[in-house]
């Protein structure tokens, strides 16, 4: 399953250090780690709008199994497909992994909107422009944009951004209500992957010149103490330009 991505750093360094410069080749997804650090030659991943509680309660759902190897996809499908879980395939494992990771940043922002009490217009705005940032960043990292228009991309993004059950949504909501990131981390029993995702994405954007205004201001709210309402004000004043400019 897609749980996140990471980078290799020198001892004593952190992603928040200002002198860290990231290139797309510095980013490690789970499959890349497995292929480089073990003897495994065939890997796959599962990603999609798969909120665990709903699946456990037998609500209808669908997922994507991605692998370069057809036999890995077939094996995964035979293991999990049921009358309540539909399975789709994709051969671009890297894009599917990135889709599953990058959506967590937008879930933080969605939670912040929810915490401020805003409605569906604001959420639709965020999801649509957030998808654009995800696609811009992922294509700069070498992924194909097609996967982001399916279940693993827009499907997972919608589910995660609209569900209070999402860990990342919860962090964003608490941040909007005045808690600091440190307070949230100290009182949370689960890890919100979006926190690290935001820091890596922002650093990569700084290094490559990719415009990611939503991620930039989520970062400022998380790590630099910017008030969430103030972050939203900056985004509402941002000159977005052409609609669907990521296609």
Where are these regions (language model features)?
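Short glycine-/small-residue-rich Rossmann-like dinucleotide-binding loops
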Residues: 3, 67-68, 163
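Internal alpha-helical scaffold of NAD(P)-dependent oxidoreductase catalytic cores
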Residues: 33-43, 60-147
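Short, small-residue-enriched loops and turns at beta-alpha junctions
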Residues: 5-7, 96-97, 190-191
